[in-house]
């Protein structure tokens, strides 16, 4: 074809300079250093550190496991939607982060489903605003869960309906009753992932 290429062509690391600093920058990312702190530590310009952050995070986004095996735990996490940087807010501003105007789970919160197996393979899916539904679970979980997996969740009705329709073994742990562990069934791995 007459074109030149190398192993990095077509990847997020293509055409980046200072290859000797990449591992040190990855360590800065893992240590949750700010862009300016990383730039100061590596002696590069802050714009370079900012561009690198986006390139490295693109790599992390594509590095996901293909399938969960064995015992898989699933739980949902609700976060307030951030409109930081938006020129036109769709709601009144929340000063200093704040809290939702409505109590409980509402359309102000984004639902994130986290599924994790006992080997540590973790997948997360943004399902939308408001309460979790079985339709949202059907959209994200079937491609990444084996048919012979045991799905362990809390008592949410959407998981029960999804597992029944998908033909997946399901066991619910009744957290409201104070039962956190039933033999090998618990959702502590995925809840620990939430707390990070």
Language-model segments: which ranges?
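Residue-level recognition of single "structural anchor" positions
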Residues: 1-196
């Amino acid at each position: 074809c007459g074109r030149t290429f190398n192993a990095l062509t077509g990847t997020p690391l293509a055409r980046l300079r200072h290859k000797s600093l990449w591992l040190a920058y990855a360590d800065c990312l893992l240590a949750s250093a700010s862009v300016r702190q990383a730039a100061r530590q590596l002696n590069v310009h802050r714009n370079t550190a900012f561009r690198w952050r986006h390139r490295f995070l693109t790599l992390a986004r594509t590095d996901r496991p293909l399938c969960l095996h064995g015992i898989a735990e699933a739980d949902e996490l609700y976060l307030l939607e951030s409109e930081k940087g938006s020129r036109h807010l769709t709601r009144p501003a929340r000063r200093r982060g704040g809290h939702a105007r409505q109590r409980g789970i509402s359309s102000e919160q984004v639902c994130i489903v986290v599924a994790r197996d006992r080997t540590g393979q973790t997948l997360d899916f943004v399902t939308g605003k408001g309460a979790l539904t079985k339709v949202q679970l059907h959209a994200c979980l079937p491609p990444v869960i084996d048919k012979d997996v045991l799905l362990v969740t809390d008592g949410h009705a959407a998981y029960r309906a999804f597992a029944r329709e998908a033909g997946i073994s399901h066991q619910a742990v009744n957290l409201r009753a104070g039962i956190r562990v039933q033999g090998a069934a618990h959702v502590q791995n995925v809840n620990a992932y939430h707390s990070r």
